[in-house]
Amino acid sequence: MNRAFSRKKDKTWMHTPEALSKHFIPYNAKFLGSTEVEQPKGTEVVRDAVRKLKFARHIKKSEGQKIPKVELQISIYGVKILEPKTKEVQHNCQLHRISFCADDKTDKRIFTFICKDSESNKHLCYVFDSEKCAEEITLTIGQAFDLAYRKFLESGGKDVETRKQIAGLQKRIQDLETENMELKNKVQDLENQLRITQVSAPPAGSMTPKSPSTDIFDMIPFSPISHQSSMPTRNGTQPPPVPSRSTEIKRDLFGAEPFDPFNCGAADFPPDIQSKLDEMQEGFKMGLTLEGTVFCLDPLDSRC
């Protein structure tokens, strides 16, 4: 029987939710390495990976090489693998990418987890050697996944929706900035044309045009028709035509479509952001297998 969350009755969590959600739990271990596996879950899968990396460790040990020590930082956001002294992050395994985690029952020092690589999308099995904390580290990763899973259920997917809204607004801002730059270039071109027209001298013997009348604010009354007809020409070329009114109805003062919060439609997200959101949701749906226990993204009261 699989439940949304279940664990063996003799296993209890040892950390407070605040420790994993607001901070992290550190552990020290030796890093045997990582190797690609064909499946995201399975005892046989990790057993073969452990055997392969143990053999590689013995070869390195016979050559005088030491197994590197690492620090693990476990939280609801994932498992970070750092160099203990410099704190340089070597690997950052996000929780929704971790699908299997177990400690070796035949070797109490060994624990392992399978994580999907963010760049290659291959499943990698990470193997560690911890003298006293192998089982505790495995349970801590399971607790972190459980807390992240419950946080997702409580939010009702609002976190994902919030990220989508932010992505949509960021795209809207980027589009407006692009439009603004294009409009600036158009204004600059019009100013250059106007400057060239103004500096051109009138033909010899021509009469000085009569100054138009002004209003009470000492300004020339605006008339689209008279303005267009009074625009001088140079070398027989006409100034750029004034856009018709029909093309301006759906544009604001700056040439952009007016923003309507009630008619903006569904956001069109950039492919990279959308794929990350879909991948995160799919990772939680797959769940985390912990010592034969499955955490899956189902309603809390469901039964499979």
From Swiss-Prot:
GO-annotated biological processes: apoptotic process; lipid transport; phagocytosis, engulfment
Listed GO CC annotations: cytoplasm
UniProt region (Disordered), positions on chain: 223-246
Compartment(s): Cytoplasm
Record has Transferase as a keyword: no
Residues with PTM Phosphothreonine: 16
Tissue spec. comment: Widely expressed. Detected in macrophages, pancreas, kidney, skeletal muscle, heart, colon, intestine, lung, placenta and ovary.
A Pfam family: PID
Keyword Coiled coil: yes
InterPro entries the UniProt entry points to: Adapter_Engulfment-Domain, PH-like_dom_sf, PTB/PI_dom
Record's keyword terms, sorted: Apoptosis, Coiled coil, Cytoplasm, Lipid transport, Phagocytosis, Phosphoprotein, Transport
Coiled coil: 158-202
Function text: May function as an adapter protein. Required for efficient phagocytosis of apoptotic cells. Modulates cellular glycosphingolipid and cholesterol transport. May play a role in the internalization and endosomal trafficking of various LRP1 ligands, such as PSAP. Increases cellular levels of GTP-bound ARF6.
Listed name of the protein: PTB domain-containing engulfment adapter protein 1
Species of provenance: Homo sapiens (Human)
Organism taxonomic ancestry: Eukaryota, Metazoa, Chordata, Craniata, Vertebrata
